[in-house]
Structure formats: C-alpha cells, structure tokens
C-alpha cells in the first residue's frame, strides 16, 4: 500500500513536467520549476539504481556460491540502470532546447 502524501509534501511537489517544452525563459519562476523537476527526475532514477544495488548485494550475500546464476536478473538490471541513469543537470538541455516539432 502506498504511503499517503501529506499536505506539506503536496505543496512542494512540482506541478510542471520535467522538460523545457512550453516554458517561457523570461518567467524565472516557471524556469526554476522546470529545472527543479528535471533534477528531481534524475535523482529518482539514481535512487532507483541504488535500491537495485542494495537488493543485488543482499542477493549475493544470501545466495553465496550460487550468486552468479541466482542474481543474474538483478545484475543485468543494475548494469542497465548504471549506464542510463546519471545526474546530468539541466544546463545542456536548457541551452540546446528544441521544441518538439511534428514529424513530416
């Protein structure tokens, strides 16, 4: 069962998507919200990788000599998350932003 979200948490939860689409760069409040949302999403992915790493270490300890065959799925998932999910920041995306254009 998911943990209920408090009013204080909901007040700080971002209301903008983690992208610069539709953000007016002169509106500093909306720009900062978009930056925070992007950083937050990157950290969520990093923390997901950390959780998989913790489960992998528990599996290695639990399985002992059979860890190579018993923990393979966690190892593959962790290596995939490790290569994809890094905190990169928002500056490159902000400075090189191209609006989504329809494909022709």
Curated annotation (Swiss-Prot):
Record's subunit section: Complex I is composed of about 40 different subunits.
List the lineage, top down.
Eukaryota, Fungi, Dikarya, Ascomycota, Pezizomycotina
List cystine links. none
Please state which protein family the record places this protein in. Answer: Belongs to the complex I NDUFS6 subunit family.
Location of the protein in the cell: Mitochondrion inner membrane
Q: Which UniProt keywords apply?
A: Electron transport, Membrane, Mitochondrion, Mitochondrion inner membrane, Respiratory chain, Transit peptide, Transport
The reply to whether Lyase figures as a keyword in the UniProt entry is no
Q: How does it sit in the membrane?
A: Peripheral membrane protein
- Entry protein name: NADH-ubiquinone oxidoreductase 12 kDa subunit, mitochondrial
> Listed GO cellular component terms?
mitochondrial inner membrane; respiratory chain complex I
